Amino acid sequence: MPRVSARQNWWRKIDKTGLTYFIKDMPYIEFHRWILAAVLAMARIGGAFAVCPALTESMIPGVARRAAVLGFSCLAIPFIKTGMPPGEPNYWMFSFLAVKEAVIGFIIGYFAAVPFWIVENVGNFIDNQRGATMGEVYSPLSGAQVSTTGIFFTQLVCTIFFVGGAILVFLGALYSSYSLWPVFPAEVSGAPFLAFSSDAAVQMLDSLDGMLRDTVVISAPVIIVMFLATVGLGLVNRTAPQLNVFFLSMPVKSALGIAMLIVYLPFIMDMLMYTRKSAILGPVQKLLEG
């Protein structure tokens, strides 16, 4: 009696569920259409995951991250499969569609990542004013050297992103984007077409301007206190030149900065976490023509 390998035994267990018979009975073209729908779904969702700091490769390891992308893509695969044009798939067209889906995912991930970049810049501003930039550490969220307050803020926002429900807002924006920008739009000259709005460059610059403006507004109270402390230490240096104000300023500014953060941190979190689906899809809708 021939021996049965572990792989054959595994396939026999699957045969009992009927999964293998389902795949065998499926037409060849139909099977490829399901595979192409999965690829297109993973292109948009994987592109968004690649940009959002809380979901990058450095935060979620490779296998777990790819499994998460595939799992979240499964919800969009039937919707994409339903909208496919009839007939045998055109693989050149699907290649262009995959690139288009990745671009849309990158743009959605970019606007979802704005709060993370804002708080990191706020931390850098505060640490620059209190003279603590020498204590920079590596941030797995951005892959760069950031200040201690900056990485504290980014990790705090990352925690709230998962615990506070912002991940649901992010996923809701991703799934809602399929109704705004379908995978199979109207074709121009037989090729898939992704139309940017006429003022797309202005919209991108406006988003960068808003990011810098929010950074300055959020960090302004702490920086003003630091400035007043610097003025006060300057007056002390005028009246008592024998004191080494430079070394005295570092602990004084650090203590004032930490005290201000304790008072001001709830307002910072409320300002940043007031995020709705429209906050992500609104700028994208201005950037792309649906």
Where are these regions (language model features)?
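Hydrophobic alpha-helical segments and their helix-loop boundaries in membrane
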Residues: 10-290
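Extreme N-terminal basic, low-complexity initiation segments
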Residues: 1-13
